[in-house]
Amino acid sequence: MAPDTHPGQSASANVYDAVEYPGFAYAHTHPDQLAVMALLYGLDPPPVETCRVLEVACNEGANLIPMAYTIPGAKFVGFDIAPECVARGQEHINALGLKNIRLFAADMLNVGPELGQFDYIIAHGLYAWVPEPVRDRALALCGELLKPNGVAFVSYNALPGSHLRQM
């Protein structure tokens, strides 16, 4: 059985497309927030106005699209293993006429340096529910793709707070 499928599902089908996972904009992942946190810890973060941001497992881009809309001088890249989610996100990007954002479908285990380097890398939520090889790869991508003064945001959803969004 392919790692992205469940019993009874074909290898070409993707469980992340089969079960809808709604996306949201998360203010605490915004480059403005990440830059301020970095400053508070004595770091010298990259300027937000011209930053390059990667979101790992971006779903349909609901977190990245508002950032791209409000920071036109920055560049945004997101990928997700679910092609249908990425396609929905691309429809929103096209409708808004955004030119500073790119979404694509990819397995995290198969991406790397070809993406370039980033000032900010976001891996929100996924770390809590993906298998160990994917968690390891998420951290490795931060090491490979983060610029020297870059900031990585890796969150871990834990009970009981992680179920608040279901209320």
Segments the model singles out, each with a brief description of its role:
Residues 136-148:
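A short glycine-rich, Lys/Arg-flanked "PGG" loop and its adjoining helix->strand segment in the class I
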Residues 97-108:
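Conserved SAM-binding strand-loop segment of SAM-dependent methyltransferases
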Residues 75-80:
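Conserved SAM-binding motif I beta-strand of class I
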Residues 112-121:
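A short acidic, Gly/Pro-enriched loop at the edge of an enzyme's catalytic core
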Residues 151-167:
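Conserved class I S-adenosyl-L-methionine
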Residues 18, 22-51, 66:
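Conserved alpha-helix/loop element of class I SAM-dependent methyltransferases that forms part
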Residues 60-73:
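Conserved SAM-binding loop of SAM-dependent methyltransferases across substrates and taxa
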Residues 82-84:
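Conserved SAM/SAH-binding beta-strand->alpha-helix loop
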